[in-house]
């Protein structure tokens, strides 16, 4: 296969300083470099780039379920929720989910990019779907 993995994730942000604070405090990102209009972080081993773009439309982003999901341990769920609240992060109402589907917290960065912190794994999700969703086809 030619594709080896995800190289980096890039977000357009409206205010670089505000976003740097969010990615450091909330996501515990390691700031690697900062320029006039860009910043690079390492988050969970992944390169995350922020590019400041002040003149693009941002309203459409709120209508999509598109998001980046991070894995968290079940025992860290409440601690993360508390950190989000302490940093005045916009926490989204999550979808209704079966207890077998584990737990998630959905929230946004200052520009409305959606994030999820999820306690489950892909294997757990597939097993739950096999048990509860007979209309699905598995390969």
UniProtKB/Swiss-Prot annotation:
PROSITE patterns: VOC (PS51819). One of its GO terms (biological process) is response to antibiotic. Its cofactor is Mg(2+). InterPro entries: Fosfomycin_Res_Enzymes, Glyas_Bleomycin-R_OHBP_Dase, Glyas_Fos-R_dOase_dom, Metallothiol_Trafse_FosB, VOC. Mg(2+) binds at residues 8, 67, 116. Its main location: cytoplasm. One of its GO terms (molecular function) is transferase activity, transferring alkyl or aryl (other than methyl) groups. Residues 5-120 form the VOC domain. The active site is at 116 (proton donor/acceptor). It is an enzyme of class 2 (transferase). Keywords: Antibiotic resistance, Cytoplasm, Magnesium, Metal-binding, Transferase. Belongs to the fosfomycin resistance protein family. FosB subfamily. Metallothiol transferase which confers resistance to fosfomycin by catalyzing the addition of a thiol cofactor to fosfomycin. L-cysteine is probably the physiological thiol donor. NCBIfam families: Fos_BSH (NF000493), PRK04101.1 (NF003152). This is Metallothiol transferase FosB. It comes from Bacillus cytotoxicus (strain DSM 22905 / CIP 110041 / 391-98 / NVH 391-98). The gene is fosB.
